[in-house]
């Protein structure tokens, strides 16, 4: 299964991705982790990214897509993966789709964790209070408001893009973590046993 999790900051994407990884053998692919790994490995695209980052510049979408293209060919991604932190806008989504099409594949689903902004604020405040050493710098109302504004501006068109393609699945992210996990498994047609998602997505048993 090739999957994207969408949701605003504090929605619990990381937790849900980790649960899917552990229960269903999907590997969580973080854009930042992939960039650092590509640089460390000295791959061709990693060297390009290293030079760009050394200049303090943002890594272009085509370079990030190239790194993703290399990463999903690795053995641990054979059972599927969850993209974390990419795409963030429609242009990136189109570039990702083009790359996957070139490999003769496509995304299976895009899961949106729907969470009310006011609930997110409470979650962030709770997380900040529980963090050892004091609140994280970005865990305050002003920082969250800015992050949510950027998220909504970028992601609203992205949600519409995947909805038009029939890929979007939306769950109620305001439920408990266990309930959200259950919803995700339900909309994807997967059970606690690995591999059962295939029959739901393809109609084959």
Curated annotation (Swiss-Prot):
Q: Which UniProt keywords apply?
A: ATP-binding, Cytoplasm, Kinase, Nucleotide biosynthesis, Nucleotide-binding, Transferase
User: Cross-referenced InterPro entries, in alphabetical order?
Assistant: Adenylat/UMP-CMP_kin, Adenylat_kinase_CS, P-loop_NTPase
On the tree of life, the source organism's domain of life is Bacteria
Q: In which pathway does it act?
A: Purine metabolism; AMP biosynthesis via salvage pathway; AMP from ADP: step 1/1
- Positions binding AMP in this chain are 31, 36, 57-59, 85-88, 92, 136, 147
List the Pfam families hit by this protein, alphabetically.
ADK
Q: What is its main location?
A: cytoplasm
Gene3D superfamilies referenced in this protein's UniProt entry, alphabetically? P-loop containing nucleotide triphosphate hydrolases (3.40.50.300)
This enzyme's EC code(s): 2.7.4.3
Q: Which GO terms describe its biological process?
A: AMP salvage
Q: Where in the cell is it found?
A: Cytoplasm
Binding positions for ATP?
10-15, 127, 175
Region entry NMP, spans: 30-59
Domains as described in the record: Consists of three domains, a large central CORE domain and two small peripheral domains, NMPbind and LID, which undergo movements during catalysis. The LID domain closes over the site of phosphoryl transfer upon ATP binding. Assembling and dissambling the active center during each catalytic cycle provides an effective means to prevent ATP hydrolysis.
Return the PANTHER family for the record. NUCLEOTIDE KINASE (PTHR23359)
What family does the database annotate?
Answer: Belongs to the adenylate kinase family.
This protein's name: Adenylate kinase
Annotated source species: Parvibaculum lavamentivorans (strain DS-1 / DSM 13023 / NCIMB 13966)
Gene designation: adk
């Amino acid at each position: 299964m090739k999957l994207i999790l969408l949701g605003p900051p504090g929605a619990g994407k990381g937790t849900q991705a980790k649960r899917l990884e552990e229960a269903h053998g999907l590997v969580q692919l973080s854009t930042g982790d992939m960039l650092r790994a590509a640089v460390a490995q000295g791959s061709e695209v990693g060297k390009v990214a290293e030079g760009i980052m050394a200049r303090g510049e943002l890594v272009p979408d085509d370079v990030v897509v190239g790194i993703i293209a290399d990463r999903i060919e690795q053995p641990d991604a054979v059972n599927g993966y969850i993209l974390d932190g990419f795409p963030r806008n429609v242009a990136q989504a189109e570039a990702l789709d083009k790359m996957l099409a070139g490999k003769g594949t496509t995304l299976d689903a895009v899961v949106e964790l729907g969470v009310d902004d006011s609930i997110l604020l409470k979650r962030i405040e709770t997380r900040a209070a529980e963090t050892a050493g004091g609140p994280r710098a970005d865990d305050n109302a002003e920082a969250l408001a800015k992050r949510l504004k950027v998220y909504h501006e970028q992601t609203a068109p992205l949600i519409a893009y995947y909805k038009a393609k029939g890929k979007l699945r939306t769950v109620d992210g305001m439920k408990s973590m266990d309930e959200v996990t259950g919803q995700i498994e339900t909309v994807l047609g997967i059970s606690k046993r690995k591999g059962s998602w295939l029959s739901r997505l393809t109609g084959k048993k």
